[in-house]
Design a protein with these regions (language model features):
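N-terminal loops that bind phosphate or other acidic moieties
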Residues: 1-179
Length: 179
C-alpha cells in the first residue's frame, strides 16, 4: 500500500493528510425483480444510520482518523441538509435494467462527473470509497458483464440476505438484451 501511495503521490515520502471516506448511496430499480430480501427503504434508512454515526463505517472512520462524507447520488428519499451529507442526486434511483436501460447516457456522465469532482476537491491525500444501495450487488454484476463480456454471476458472491429469498432472481440475463 505504501508503494502504491508513493507512486500515486510521486514521492518517496508518503503523506496521509486528512484521510477521507466517501460513501455513495443510491437506489437500484432492478430491486423490482425480487433480487433482495430487503425492501428498498433500507437504503435511505442506512443513510440515516451513517448520518447518525451508528454504522460500522462510522466506527472505522473514527478509529482511523478519516472524515466521513455520505453522498446522496440517487436515493429515492429526500434528506434535509446535514453536515455530513453531500447532495449529488442524479435521479431518485435508477430504472429497472431488466426492462429498460437503468440510466441515460447523460445521467451516467453526470454521476461520474459528480464522483470525480468530489474526489478531486476533497482536501485529502487518501480517499476511500464505499457504497450503499439495496440491489447494488446485482447492478455491479451487470456492469462487470457489460465491461468484460463474461457471464453474469461470476463477479459477485452471495448477496446480503440472499439466503432469505424464496428463489434466485436472474435479472442480469434479462438485461443483456439491452444496450
Amino acid at each position: 500500500l505504501a508503494a502504491q501511495l508513493g507512486l500515486i503521490q510521486r514521492s518517496t515520502r508518503v503523506s496521509i493528510d486528512q484521510p477521507a471516506i466517501l460513501v455513495f448511496a443510491a437506489d437500484h430499480g432492478v430491486v423490482a425483480e425480487g433480487i433482495s430480501a430487503f425492501p428498498q427503504d433500507v437504503t435511505w434508512q442506512m443513510v440515516e444510520n451513517f448520518l447518525g454515526n451508528g454504522a460500522a463505517i462510522n466506527v472505522f472512520a473514527r478509529q482511523n482518523g478519516c472524515a466521513l462524507h455520505v453522498v446522496d447520488a440517487g436515493v429515492n428519499h429526500d434528506f434535509g441538509p446535514r453536515p455530513q451529507l453531500l447532495h449529488r442526486k442524479v435521479a431518485n434511483g435508477t430504472r429497472n435494467f431488466a426492462l429498460e436501460p437503468a440510466m441515460t447516457a447523460q445521467e451516467c456522465a453526470t454521476a461520474l462527473d459528480h464522483g470525480m469532482v468530489l474526489a478531486r476537491d476533497l482536501p485529502a491525500t487518501v480517499v476511500g470509497f464505499g457504497e450503499m444501495g439495496i440491489g447494488n450487488t446485482t447492478s455491479a454484476d451487470a456492469l462487470m458483464h457489460k465491461l468484460t463480456g463474461q457471464p453474469g454471476g461470476r463477479w459477485v458472491g452471495a448477496r446480503g440476505g440472499s439466503a432469505l429469498l424464496p428463489r434466485p432472481a436472474r435479472p442480469v440475463p434479462k438485461g443483456r438484451r439491452l444496450t
